[in-house]
Amino acid sequence: MTNRLELSGVIAKDPKRSQSPAGVPHCHFVLEHRSYQREADLPRQVYCYINVVSSGKGLQVLTQDLAVGVHTKVAGFISYQTGRNGIGKLVLHADHIEIICSGD
């Protein structure tokens, strides 16, 4: 089964860094994507807001420069997660992060 998503956008919320009990570093942030796509030969404005998590020491260096307003491209797989409040959401588990342009 294929499960791969690549999305570019702007960091919309300050990244939150944490570490699992096993010592695995995590970085959670929200990516806001806006673009125009073609559907049925017509232009369509597209918008999405997705939670992203990157895990592992290999990605830790790449997340150091992430901040609100930074244009970023992420790739990875998506998974459904249920929060403590019982509300579910799709989360992009990034295995590739590329800063396109800083927010300065």
From Swiss-Prot:
GO terms for molecular function: single-stranded DNA binding. Residues 1-101 form the SSB domain. GO terms for biological process: DNA replication, synthesis of primer. One of its GO terms (cellular component) is primosome complex. SUPFAM superfamilies: Nucleic acid-binding proteins. InterPro entries: NA-bd_OB-fold, Primosome_PriB/ssb, Prisomal_replication_PriB. Keywords: DNA replication, DNA-binding, Primosome. The keyword DNA-binding applies. Belongs to the PriB family. Involved in the restart of stalled replication forks, which reloads the replicative helicase on sites other than the origin of replication; the PriA-PriB pathway is the major replication restart pathway. During primosome assembly it facilitates complex formation between PriA and DnaT on DNA; stabilizes PriA on DNA. Stimulates the DNA unwinding activity of PriA helicase. Homodimer. Interacts with PriA and DnaT. Component of the replication restart primosome. Primosome assembly occurs via a 'hand-off' mechanism. PriA binds to replication forks, subsequently PriB then DnaT bind; DnaT then displaces ssDNA to generate the helicase loading substrate. This is Replication restart protein PriB.
